Every structure is written in C-alpha cells, then in structure tokens.
C-alpha cells in the first residue's frame, strides 16, 4: 500500500498544474501582465517539484534527486516573489532575487557533494525559501497605504507559509551531520501536514488578490470616461461625496468643478 504522503504529493501535483493553467489564462486575458506570467511559471516549477518527489525512485543518485528538488523549490519561490514585485512596482531587481536563489543552490551543493552534512543539506534551501516568502509578505502589505482585504490575507498566508517552512527547516537542521530517525519523523509530519495546507491557502489568496485587482479596474472603468479619463457623472458624485465627508472635518473651503463633455465627445 502506498504511503499517505504519496497521496498528498499527488494532490499537490495536480493542484499546481491547475493553478499554473489558471494564472496562464489570467495572463492571456488581463492584458498579458508580466506578474501573472511569473505566477504561472512559479506554479509550473512547483509542479516539477512535486513530480520530482513522486518519481524519486527513478533517479540513480539520491544526491541528484535532492539537488533538483532543492533547485526547483527555490526557483518556484523566486518566480513568485518576482511576480509580486512586478505587481506592486517594488524596486527590487530580479538579479537580487536570482542571486539569493543561486547562493542557496551553491550552499546546498557544497553540503551535499563536497562536505556532506545532512542537517545543512536539508535546511539551507528552506531558509532561502523563508527569506523570499517574508520579502513577498512585506511587499504585498506595503503596496498601499490602506491594503485591501485580499492583500492582507495574501500577505498573512505568505507569512504563515514561511513560518511553517521555518519550523521544518529548524527540525531538519537540528539533526546535525547524521540522520536522526525521530527528528525525520517530526520533519515529515510538518512537511506533509502544515505545509500543504499553507501552500494551498497562499495560492487561493493570490487568486483572490488578482480578482480584487480586476474588480477595482472594473469599478474605475465604470466611474470614468474612456475618452478623457475624467470622472463621469457617477464617478464625480461618488468621489465628490467622499471628499466632502473628509473636508467637513477640516476648517477649510472646498471647490468642486463639474462640466458636461457630451458635446465635446460628439
């Protein structure tokens, strides 16, 4: 009988395929925004990661299997962080994110092949993932003065996901140079219970966040004139009402300008 963990990996594999397709379709239909493509590629990399774990018995070398898995894991998070930086116009150069990933790969390679150390080999790439996820969490929440509910949820889920990975990494590191069977069991419990739930939750909130972006764009479109980018009657009324409510609290005069542009458009 297959291990219960195998069924979790199969579920994550197909979930990642679906999420990658969803974000690719989002990229196609939302003006080919680069961040949507980055999200699609991120989940595609996750698909490769789960496939790598499912078919690890096909590898002739366990070290090769491990290096591929670690590299794809970091690539997935790098692409996701890159996508969030593009969405929020955060001035973090992609080379910085790639550099963090490459540095993690080099350290993992060193402690896998050159100076074998099980604890460091199993934990270093996870610490890199934690760093990138924390960057993403901050980038999302700092994007606006007043964050939308979807952004708060997405930022929180990235933070929770990072904390779950941090716990798993710390358990792996505490083994030291040699394997500790009890710690490996604890690591597996965290890795296959908390992590999948946090991963799916994070994915759903990213979709919710993009849906919220689209809703705001549609709201703006409904309140502005497409030819002049000025507020239409509905937009003027809504914006003016909000401004008047704000200015009522301040001892100063307000001036509102309203004009009819129908003849101009004709």
Predicted features along the sequence, with ranges:
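Hydrophobic transmembrane alpha-helical segments in integral membrane proteins
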Residues: 1-17
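Amphipathic coiled-coil signal-transmission "stalk" helices
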Residues: 193, 200-203, 214, 221, ...
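Charged, elongated alpha-helical coiled-coil/linker "stalk" segments that transmit conformational signals
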Residues: 207-209, 213-220, 242, 246
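Juxtamembrane segments at transmembrane-helix boundaries
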Residues: 17-36, 47-182, 189, 199, ...
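Active-site-proximal structural segments of metal-dependent nucleotidyl cyclase/transferase enzymes
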Residues: 239-266
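Conserved nucleotide-binding and Mg2+-coordinating catalytic segments in signaling enzymes
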Residues: 219-238, 259-265
């Amino acid at each position: 009988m297959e291990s219960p963990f195998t069924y979790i990996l199969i579920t994550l594999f197909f979930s990642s395929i679906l999420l990658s397709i969803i974000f690719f379709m989002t990229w196609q239909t939302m003006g080919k925004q680069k961040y949507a493509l980055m999200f699609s590629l991120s989940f595609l990399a996750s698909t490769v990661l789960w496939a790598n774990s499912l078919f690890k018995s096909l590898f002739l070398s366990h070290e090769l299997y491990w290096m591929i898995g670690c590299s794809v894991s970091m690539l997935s998070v790098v692409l996701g962080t890159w996508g969030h930086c593009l969405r929020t116009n955060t001035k973090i150069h992609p080379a910085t994110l790639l550099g963090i990933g490459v540095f993690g790969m080099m350290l993992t390679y060193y402690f896998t092949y050159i100076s074998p150390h099980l604890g460091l080999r199993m934990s270093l790439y996870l610490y890199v993932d934690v760093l990138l996820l924390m960057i993403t969490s901050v980038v999302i929440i700092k994007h606006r003065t007043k964050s939308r509910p979807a952004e708060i949820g997405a930022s929180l889920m990235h933070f929770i996901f990072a904390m779950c990975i941090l716990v798993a990494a710390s358990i792996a590191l505490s083994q030291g140079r040699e394997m500790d069977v009890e710690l490996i069991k604890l690591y597996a419990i965290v890795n296959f219970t908390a992590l999948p739930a946090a991963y799916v939750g994070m994915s759903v909130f990213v979709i919710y966040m993009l849906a919220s972006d689209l809703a705001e764009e549609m709201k703006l479109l409904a309140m502005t004139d497409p030819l002049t980018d000025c507020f239409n009657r509905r937009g003027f009324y809504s914006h003016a009402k909000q401004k008047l409510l704000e200015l009522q609290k301040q001892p100063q005069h307000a001036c509102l300008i309203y004009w009819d542009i129908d003849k101009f458009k004709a």
